[in-house]
Every structure is written in C-alpha cells, then in structure tokens.
C-alpha cells in the first residue's frame, strides 16, 4: 500500500513510497520498470531504523509517504518525510528543500510498543508529511500538509515557507489531502480527520485567497 507516481512521459516507470511494500527500511522508495521487471531502491536517505526512536533518526518517513511528479517538469519528483525532498534525476540524488514542516514534538517521537518489547518495524513514525501538491497553475508553488495538523506553502520552489494552517483546524489533525482548483489558482481545498483522537467530525476547508483565510465547507456531512 502507499503512494504511487507514474512517470509522465513513460508509463512503464512507476515510483512507490511505502515502507511496508518492499525492503529498504526507513523511507523505502521504489523505482519499478515494467519492461525489465526490476526494482531499484532510491531512498532519499538510506538509514536503518529498526530499534531506533524516530527522534534519533536523521529524517522521518511515514509508513506511506507522498511521492509526486511536478506538473511542470517531468524530470522533477518530490518525496515527503518530515522535510520535503526534490530530485531532478529520477531519484538518483535528493535535496531537502524545506525545514522540518511538522510540529517536531520530541515527546511524540519516542519508541513505540508495549512493556516487554518495542515496535521495531518502522511503522510508528509520525510528525511527517501526509500530503503534498505542486500548483498546476504556478511552477514552484508547493503545498505540504502533515499528519500532526500543519499546512505550509512555498511560492518560490522551497526557498521560503509560510504556515497557512486554517485557524479553526484542531491541533493534531491528520491532513489527508490538499487540492488546488483546476479553474482558479487561488482556490485551495483541505480535508483532515481526527478519528484516532476519538473525534469523528469531518474537517473540510476551502480558501479562495491562496491560503490567507479559510472557510469550513463541512455542510451536512
């Protein structure tokens, strides 16, 4: 399971960002070629995470993490950990283009598991990006949401970032999706959930001014 990204100019090349779908450890990222039926591991930062607390790792990646091609450049692909990463050469090298965009609260990043043994599978890594999109209208306008309830935008390809989280969105919400209207570059949609915190209300927002203000569009959900 996980995010996939199909190469815009070659549908035989597929990228998958999912720790549980392959070997490769923390941040396992695959490049699969249907012609040769070969998989190449192109992890952003190959690092053994077994038995380590997430706070002690250089970078954190969720069990499934965003992998997205730029709509403006088929040679550019993004991957989301606690930072946003970018590659211009099909994942052979990566560059961090953001600071840590999560809350990065150390008390939330310890070892998980029970009293006798700890979970060492790498599944319990939080404070990471849960969704990412580059504006189809404006090259370099990057929107990133996290699993701990923060939304950031960069309008210069990652050089500078601004927090634009809806003020009414409760803390620790899981931002599941950020989408930009196909008809208007300044209309942004956001969906979030808090069911893991025993909150089953829907959280749907729309901004009509590029993230400056947000309105709830829950309606009668």
For every predicted segment, state its role.
Residues 1-221:
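Beta-propeller blade termini and top-face loops
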